[in-house]
């Protein structure tokens, strides 16, 4: 997440008040003394939940905005309905009371939560930042939607047929 956080800081310095960013790439880690490589997607949100409301409301993002974004992403693989979220407190970069593990068939495929206050201070972030990371290989190993060709016929904006008796006049 360091790259995402640095990008957020850069955008905040340019007076952006609503930031939603993501990146994808390979992540390397060590498990049982072996080097493991995974393809992941990570994202971060900060600032206003909605751009320019007519009533002037300025509601900030929260955990549920992040959860909605992650579930929308999972819906492309048609697995959002089968994913579960479980509270977790053992991720050093995330706030212990506002973090979750994302599970698919009881197997962890990602993490999501609020940036830990100490890290927020380190980066100089005064607003709450919410982050997620998904293992793309695990998420995409599930059902992938298939392409459907576009219809040859244009969409109709309206189509109305009314059948009436010949005895009825237009004025009736």
Where are these regions (language model features)?
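Extended beta-strand-rich architecture
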Residues: 1-172
